[in-house]
């Protein structure tokens, strides 16, 4: 019996050998990423690609303030609605802001022809030079320029009119034919606006213009149109039964525009020499204007971010991330974060990389843990860690660079007659948005899968590197660990880590210990067989005795009748 106990003690002692394990870093990160095959994978490190925050303010764009129209809209501002006098001196802006209650547009009722196209043109204008195209005091000597006012465009309680147009009426009892031209010598496009008045009755036509069969003609090299007043009774709007239609054209440099009329002309007084700017645009927002600066503005607020995607608003001004419908776009840079339970087993062994990462290893992504007579400790493999960091950093930067095409995205303008086109445009935009969102999400899923596989591969490569050095001088015990058949001090451990392990030096000692341990295993197997047989016999005897006792008790109290027949 003493010999068998000695064999068991030898078996226990043989397992308390020097060990080295390969593992990876873990930390307390709660970052999660999605891959093609998994969702919410916790990782040690990750980068966010999706901006979802803004400051709730309208800011300067690259140092240039926006033009907030307040209660006025584009029409009221350009025509010069008296309610928009605060905007008369506005000449430059980074972007134009209308609000949800921008009601002051055309004060005298009528249609603004091609208004949506004009708004579209202004989306690329960053400033203009406002000038008198036809000076009021000298351009119309044979026509009245002061009596053309209306209660519909009142100012300070008195009848008034648009600040940038002149309502020409008859002078005395005549309205002689007028013809006035302007040559664009500004060296840039000039925006010219005018109107045509449509009285409700012939009496009004005569009292204003004298001529019953009046006309208005406007012509340039690219624009040529003749208008005749449509005299008809109409429901009153703003207490006006008449109507005014408003028109505009862009006059190219060097081109000439000519106005000819015998009545009903709302003549241009001021025009605008336009300066184009690719970063401008028109947005609708009720956010307040602040003294702040940004590179990207949305109707909800400014975005200060270098990320490639945002889910704040599809309408943007400036250098902005691409809008996607995603709620999460996080790219993994680190490893799966599965911290191991640092409990010690029978011989003080730690968990290896299969069971989880090491929070104790903080100076690298991959590395080693050793245990010998001199103690235990962690050591990162700096070379493989640095190679991985460089590779992943380059990949992340490449993805951000390729996807980070920042630009302005403003809505397109359609009038009431173009609703089918507008609906089709929305469907097309939605389709592109879905494609962008799908591509962004798929890119992140694929790259996350590749990154995590890349880390797994690096750990396996490190494991194979150690295995190829040790050969049969150590055995694999699972969990990414090797148990040496020889004593391995700190210098020996370092040689394994740096790839200079001297296999022949330890091979003889390993051979002897390996044979001794194999012998102990064979002997211990005999002990285990004896113990197993003894256990089986003992349990069988206990079962038989128990059955006999139960039967005797049941016979004695009549619960069981025993009959013996001969």
UniProtKB/Swiss-Prot annotation:
Glycans are attached at residues 27-28, 40, 104, 304, 498. The record marks 344-345 as: Cleavage. InterPro entries: Capsid_hemagglutn, Hemagglutn_HA1_a/b_dom_sf, Hemagglutn_influenz_A, Hemagglutn_influenz_A/B. Keywords: Clathrin- and caveolin-independent endocytosis of virus by host, Clathrin-mediated endocytosis of virus by host, Disulfide bond, Fusion of virus membrane with host endosomal membrane, Fusion of virus membrane with host membrane, Glycoprotein, Hemagglutinin, Host cell membrane, Host membrane, Host-virus interaction, Lipoprotein, Membrane, Palmitate, Signal, Transmembrane, Transmembrane helix, Viral attachment to host cell, Viral envelope protein, Viral penetration into host cytoplasm, Virion, Virus endocytosis by host, Virus entry into host cell. It is a single-pass type I membrane protein. One of its GO terms (biological process) is clathrin-dependent endocytosis of virus by host cell. It holds the Pfam family Hemagglutinin. Disulfide bonds join 21-481, 59-292, 72-84, 107-153, 296-320, 488-492. GO terms for cellular component: host cell plasma membrane; membrane; viral envelope; virion membrane. Residues 1-17 form the signal peptide. Its main location: virion. One of its GO terms (molecular function) is host cell surface receptor binding. The keyword Transmembrane helix applies. A lipid is attached at residues 555, 562, 565 (S-palmitoyl cysteine). The chain crosses the membrane at residues 530-550. It is found in: Virion membrane; Host apical cell membrane. Major glycoprotein, comprises over 80% of the envelope proteins present in virus particle. Belongs to the influenza viruses hemagglutinin family. Binds to sialic acid-containing receptors on the cell surface, bringing about the attachment of the virus particle to the cell. This attachment induces virion internalization either through clathrin-dependent endocytosis or through clathrin- and caveolin-independent pathway. Plays a major role in the determination of host range restriction and virulence. Class I viral fusion protein. Responsible for penetration of the virus into the cell cytoplasm by mediating the fusion of the membrane of the endocytosed virus particle with the endosomal membrane. Homotrimer of disulfide-linked HA1-HA2. Interacts with human CACNA1C. This is Hemagglutinin. It comes from Influenza A virus (strain A/Brevig Mission/1/1918 H1N1) (Influenza A virus (strain A/South Carolina/1/1918 H1N1)). The gene is HA.
